[in-house]
Each structure stands twice: as structure tokens, then as C-alpha cells.
Amino acid sequence: MANTLFKKTPLLAALASALIFLAAHDSRRFANLSQSADLQEEKWVDSVFAALSEEERLGQLFMLRAHSDMDSTYHKMVEDLILKYKPGGLCVFNPSYLGTPEKHAELSNRYQAASPRVPLLIAMDFENGVGMRYKGNAISFPRAMMLGAIQDNRLLYEMGREVARECRRMGVHVNFAPVADVNNNAQNPVIGERSYGEDRHNVAAKAYQYMAGLQDGGVLACAKHFPGHGDTDQDSHDTLPAIPYRRERLDSLELFPFKMLTENGVGSVMTAHLWVPSLDKRVNWPTSLSESAIQNTLRKDLNFEGLVFTDAMEMKGVPLVFAPGEADVLALQAGNDVVLLPRNMDEAMGAVKSALQKGTLDRAKLWQSVKRILRAKYRLGLNAPQRVELANLSRDLNTPEALALKHRIVSNALALVRDEKNLIGFPNLENLKFATLAIGDTNRTVFQTYCGNYAPMAHFNTPKEVGDSLETKLLDTLRKFDIVLVGLYGIRTTPKPAKSVNPVPGVDTIYGLTHSELDFLRKLNQQHTIALTVFGNPYTYGWMDAPPLLLQAFTEDPMAQQLAAQSLFGANDLNGIMPVTAAPWACFGQGMKKIFPQKRLGYALPESVGMSTDSLALMDGIVSEMVGTGAAPGCQILVAKDNKIVWQKSYGHFTYEQAQA
């Protein structure tokens, strides 16, 4: 049947223009890797290709696993694999978070030195920034679902540029992002918050902006997981999920963001381990191994000329019935350019060489893939030796400007979902008695602390298992307060617990909330006026009653907690919308825009108001000298600009007797 949706029409062109705020720079440098961009590139590609032996050419088709958090024996094993097989690249992981950007850079230099003839493509999953893999050592921007709440899509372009800058600084060339899956299934165990939401237009626009920022910054972006992993309740890491819909449905929903991205220059696409009968009629046959899905749908219908990566071949979405190396042959047969993370490189290479000799694999097509890979390397600057400068790496990754960008992004993502009693801002707060209540966190939270900066507060906390006696006591104690500012904590990103978590029967519910927490929250909502802030996944609303005021903050990140408190008290405008439908009373697109004409003082980074953190930090030395010489026992310094406190520190003591700091 003719694929009418993908025909060039004025309507589609108008729709694309309406969807996407086109970036000011050229992000299409990787759009066509099937042809050389100029004579210089063609000469380099042809000369390198000609100099490679057949086995070395085959090595370019593989991207191997490497960890930055392992011991020297493991690193030597990776180096030996590089020397033996001459792979096209490495995909780096840091599952324990014990690896650091410095260790990553050191290993990158070591591995590149082992591949002097053709530098390696270094790839990572930085869907929401370098902090996704190097938590605590680099900046984590918000996850995609939180970004889906933003209405100013230019912020995603800026995020892409910043992540690209950080990637290049640490020697990463490929970012396996953006996630282009439309997440319209609340039970999805693997996509969820990694998606920009349930609306195809919003997903396409956000994914485009992030892609454009990455590629303008010199990093190859990768749209995943083709043809769309959003509408399933299974995880392709563990099984082969089915997407059982007709082609018309795929065209109008799942494939929609991929079409927008391929039309606008995305350089690579990752094929998913999904069974999609409308693309390949073979039963339980993954799209990652489907010539029909890749050659007909992706290459022909979507007119894609970039690199095609498989998803990780180690995943159980690749059926285990295949003989060793057979799936790798099938992946190349289907039209993938790069086999990502083969289960066993010895078996994979042996099977591919055998298939090539037997004629099962088309040599000409494989060499086309090799040349696409070489063109990508050339455009990424890998026609020259690669070495990462180790000095000042942490400082260069964690700049004040990057943190200020994150602050703007988080601020724009917070969504006021409900405010039935017009409470937001609390204009007459001097006449109100406030309490804060953190449910699911027994320690004083950042949110509670910042709420306390605006009015006298009594602070309360509960564990995840509230218990009858604590519930009764709190419900009674909180009666004396006019407003209870509730923060909900400990929410998982996925509906089911991770394999390492042992759920408590009858206690652990979806997204990690307990029956005890939900019952307590329900009673609290019935008996008190609450302002609820959810620091986690909005799909949790399906197990709640609608509160009078609901602020969706998406994450427990301290920056989100600070800004949530400021927003409740009228110091930070609210612009976010719901990226998904989470309850009948909280639908996609819902969000009350709130601009506070007379703002209370808020908190921000100096760079957010045109000042410099480094310049303000010079005060530390001046004050230390003052206190050290006895010119003063101590002091407090507060700097505010544009209604934002950007510096607030205390030094020394109140008196020379040093009785009180």
C-alpha cells in the first residue's frame, strides 16, 4: 500500500515549520553520509579505505563495550580487543558511577593510541548530559519528560550545544540521543521519563532542538529507538516487546518524530529490538534485524542517508535462538552500518567473515557502510590524531555558565497543574500559618529549607511507611496550620522496581509509592488545605486525589527543590505544562502560566543575572584577610540583582570573643 503520509506536501511542510523553531546554525553536516561533502573528504575516505585490509574494514562495522569504572586488567582487555579487531569505535559505560571524567579521558587517550591509523568513534548515552553517566562529577540536566514541559524550545537547543561542548572536551564524538520515542504508555518500564512525552509534535520539536544543538556543537546525534519504543509495557533489555499496530498508526504517531529528525539532518538512527508486524511479517523478528524496516521504511520512506546503529546486541530483545555470531550477520544484512556491543566479538567477526566468503553478506553494501563510518569520522575531525587534555577537565565541564543554563531550564519546566483556591504566591502570607511536610524523606529537605526563607515554618517529615500512630499524630498536629506545603519524595522513574530492588509485598506500589503514603496523602488532602509539590514522575497522579494546588517539579534535584519553593512564594514565574496525561484532572498541555508582577526576592546563580561567580568569589579572600587581621570579627554578605539573591555568605563570628559564629 502506498505510504501517503510521507509524500512531500505543502501541508507537511507547513506542519514541519510550525513544529520546529529552526536553529540559526547548520546542523545538517551529518545528514548525508552516503556521499562525500567535498573533494578533500573524498580523498581522505578513499585513501583510508584503500589502506585497510578486508578484516580491518570489517572491524569498522563494530562498536565495542568499554567501562571507565573497572580495574587495569579490564582496561588491558579492551586495549587488546582494539589491537586485535581494529573496531570502529567504543561505547563507554560507568554503571557503578565510580568512574570519573578524568579516568574516561585518560582511557580515551590510551585507546586512541591503540588505533593510530583510524581514530575510534567514542560514544556514550548522554541523554540528559554528561552527569547521566558521571553522576556527581558532571552536570545532569533534566530528563526528557521534564524537558517536555518547557514551552521555549530554544532552551533545548542551548542544552544540546552545552552537552556537545562537554562531550568534545572529554573526547566523546557520538551522543546516543535524542530519545524520539512517544511515551503514551504509563506502564512503559524502560522509556518513561526518557521521552519528551505523549504528544508527537512536542516530542518531534524537542528532539529536533536537542539534536540540532548537539550537531552544531560538533557531536553526532542519534535518534532512538526506531521505529518507536513508547507504547509497550515491556523492556527490550529483557525480552522482545511487540508494537502491534497498523502502518497507518505508526506513520501518524511512532514514526512521526523520526521523520521530522531525518528530514532535518539527524546524523544517525538507532534501530530497536522490537517486533513490529506491520514492518516485517516474520513472527518475533526484531526491527533491528529487519531489512524491510531498515531498507524500506528508514532508508527509502524516510529518505535517511546517515549512519544506522543497532541497539546493543547484548540485549535479550535479540532472540537467543540465533547461533553465535548469527545475529550480527543478520544485523548487517538488514542494513545497519554499525553493530553495537556484540555479545562476543570473536564469534561475531568469525561469523561475518564466513558470511562474506559464502556470499551471504554483500561485500559492496558492507563497504558502503564502512565509507559512511569514515565520512562521519572525517566530519567529526577524526582525520587527525585524538588526544584529550587532562588538565582542568572537571573545571571545564562544570562551568558556572552551564549551571546557569540548567537553572533556566529547570525554572521553565516547573508546571502549575492546579490552583483551585488561587493560593500560588501567598500574597498575604503574614496572615497565614505554614507547615512543611516531606513525605518519603525523613531528613530536612532543600525544599523545606527554602520555604522557610519566606515565612515562619514548622517542618515535619515522614518515612515511606507512615504507620497508624504517626499518621494520627500528624493529621491532628497539622490542624493548627492554614497551609501545609507537602513535598512528595522517593518516586521511581519507572513503574516497576529495578532488578536490584526487593519490593515489599502489599507495600510497594507503582513508581515506588507505598499504600501507606498514598492513604496518608488522601486523608491529608481531605482534612487540610495542602499545596502539593511532586518531586518525581507525574504518572503517580493516577493513584491520588486532586489537591487544591499542585506543582509538578519532576525531580528531587536540589535546584528543582529551590525553584519550587521560590515559585510557591511568588519569586519565580511558572510556564511549564504537563508533558503527559497522568490523571483525568491532569492532562497533556495542562499548566497555568503564572507571571508574578511584584516578585519576592528569589535565588539564582550570578551568571543568571549577568554577573560572574569567579568575580564574586574574590570577596572570600578580602573578607578572610579582614577577619584574619582583626579588622572585624566577621560579617555577612548578600548580593542581589534583578530581584535575585546571587551571593549570601557568613564569615567569622559576631564578636571578637568568638562565642557565636
List where the protein language model places each region.
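Short, conserved catalytic-motif segment at the N-terminal edge
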Residues: 608-661
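Second-shell residues forming the walls of enzyme active-site clefts
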Residues: 53, 74-77, 99-116, 120, ...
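Short acidic, glycine-rich surface-loop motifs adjacent to enzyme active sites
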Residues: 59, 80-100, 186-187, 262-285, ...
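Bacterial Sec-dependent N-terminal signal peptides
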Residues: 1-36
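Structural recognition of the beta-strand scaffold that forms the well-ordered cores
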Residues: 60-65, 88-93, 120-124, 128-130, ...
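A substrate-binding/cap region within the structured catalytic cores of diverse enzymes
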Residues: 149-172, 179-195, 200, 207, ...
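Preference for extracellular/luminal or secreted protein segments
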Residues: 25-83, 300, 322-608, 612
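Solvent-exposed loop/turn segments at secondary-structure junctions
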Residues: 67-70, 96-99, 127-131, 180-184, ...
